[in-house]
A protein has these predicted regions:
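Extended, loop-rich substrate-binding clefts of extracytoplasmic carbohydrate-active enzymes
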Residues: 1-34, 64-66, 203-204
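Hydrophobic residues positioned within well-ordered beta-strands of beta-sheet architectures
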Residues: 13-15, 26-28, 39, 55-57, ...
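Short, structured patches in soluble enzyme cores that scaffold and shape functional sites
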Residues: 17-19, 28-34, 41-45, 55-59, ...
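Coil-to-beta-strand transition motifs
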Residues: 21-25, 32-39, 48-52, 148, ...
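Short Pro-Gly-centered flexible turn/kink motifs
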Residues: 41, 213-231
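Asparagine-centered strand-capping/turn motif at beta-strand->loop junctions
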Residues: 42-47, 144, 229
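A contiguous, surface-exposed recognition patch within enzymatic or periplasmic domains that forms
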Residues: 49-53, 64-215
Length: 234
């Protein structure tokens, strides 16, 4: 836990925090523009050495919006890879398999279509996806037919080239999950896999794209992205 400051100026809400162990300062500015939240983040390396960072937005969806076999997903994803090893007790995808979004190789049986949340009674999975680098914007959209509601994010693939899709469907029995949690993470960032910084740096690249970002000592980097929520029946 780190203390943080919140300030309001006009239509903007700004949060700031300092992380002394990591040697980083962080700022997030949020502005509401019509039906979208525009978010600008700034990370500053206040230490005396360069630092490899795995800057990632951990967007996570759950019930009642999230429903097995019903909630639909779309993304500007291209080349993809399943997590290197079995991801939980109920992982149904082939470890380390490479594929093109959205059809992933299953361990025992047919392929898995990542555009629709699994209908399995229990499941767990993690896949990494390279966003289309030929486009000026990257995105994911989740659609809940029961609510006629679409929700998603838009960002620059040059800022965040990766999307990680994490699935937890009543698989983890330990606390706080207790075998009851249904969640799907749509985690866009500079690193494809949930791994240590040492492993991230050792991986270096995937599909010819860097797996982390290097922040020089005393320097800052910025990124801007949008969160959008709209009513729709398709």
């Amino acid at each position: 836990m780190a203390p943080y400051d919140l300030t309001v100026a006009g239509e903007a809400l700004t949060a700031r925090a300092r992380f002394p162990i990591a040697g980083l300062e962080f700022q997030r500015r949020v502005v509401l523009r019509q039906s979208a939240l525009v978010i600008r983040e700034t990370v500053t390396n206040v230490s005396g050495r360069d630092r490899a960072i795995g800057w990632t937005q951990h967007v996570t969806l759950g019930p009642p919006f999230l429903e097995c076999g019903t909630t639909q997903f779309r993304a500007s994803a291209t080349r993809s890879k399943v997590f290197d090893t079995v991801f939980g007790a109920d992982d149904y995808l082939e470890p380390a398999a490479e594929f093109d979004w959205p059809v992933a190789p299953a361990r025992n049986g047919p392929t898995g279509d990542l555009r629709v949340l699994s209908t399995r009674a229990r499941s767990s999975a993690y896949t990494a996806h390279l966003m289309d680098q030929q486009q000026s914007t990257a995105y994911f959209v989740a659609f809940a037919p029961a609510f006629e509601l679409a929700f998603g994010y838009v960002w620059k693939p040059s800022d965040f080239p990766w999307l990680g899709v994490w699935e937890e469907n009543r698989s983890r029995v330990n606390s706080p999950w207790n075998g009851r949690t249904l969640a799907r993470g749509m985690e866009f960032g500079v690193s494809p896999m949930p791994e240590t910084r040492e492993a991230m740096v050792a991986r270096n690249t995937l599909f010819g794209t860097p797996c982390f970002r290097r922040l020089a000592a005393g320097r800052s980097i910025e990124a801007e992205y949008c969160a959008i929520c709209r009513r729709t029946d398709v």
